[in-house]
């Protein structure tokens, strides 16, 4: 039997607005520090069919819960991401950032970026604590609605999947 551990680390998001002339109107750094760990066990099995070794979500789509998704709405670009709840007020480079490594205990945030000024506003949307953990980088936008999948792997035989809708105004 072989065990492989893969650690995915996602850092800051760099944002800028470039005018048609090529001049930079503004530049911002959104501090972010995410760490997601994937543990895979390989070996022989005496069973067949759907089981612990079979996955609905491909590991090539990893990391599932870190990273971010973005969508434009009105004069804002909205960034969705899971983060450590202690980072609720972090919007500027240089601020202390706590690592979001216990992803199942993270909060899902929407960070709005004003397209004209680059000003950042962070709002907590929900906690991932008691629900399947949000997967922001896999979100889909239809009109003003953002659909996001959540996934929980606490027990290999009792995985939970949820789909949530967020309506942008």
Predicted ranges, named:
Residues 1-169:
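Secretory-pathway ectodomains
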């Amino acid at each position: 039997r072989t065990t492989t551990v893969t650690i995915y680390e996602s850092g800051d998001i760099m944002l800028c607005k470039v005018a048609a002339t090529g001049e930079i109107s503004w530049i911002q750094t959104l501090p972010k520090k995410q760490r997601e760990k994937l543990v895979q066990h390989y070996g022989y099995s005496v069973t067949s069919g759907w089981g612990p070794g079979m996955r609905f979500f491909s590991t090539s789509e990893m990391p599932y819960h870190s990273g971010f998704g973005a969508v434009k709405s009105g004069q804002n670009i909205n960034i969705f991401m899971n983060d450590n709840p202690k980072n609720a007020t972090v919007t500027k480079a240089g601020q202390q950032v706590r690592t979001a490594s216990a992803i199942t205990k993270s909060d899902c945030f929407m960070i709005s970026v004003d397209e004209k000024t680059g000003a950042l506003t962070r709002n907590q949307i929900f906690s991932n604590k008691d629900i399947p953990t949000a997967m922001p980088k896999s979100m889909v936008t239809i009109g003003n609605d953002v659909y996001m999948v959540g996934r929980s792997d606490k027990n290999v035989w009792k995985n939970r999947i949820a789909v949530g809708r967020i309506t942008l105004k």
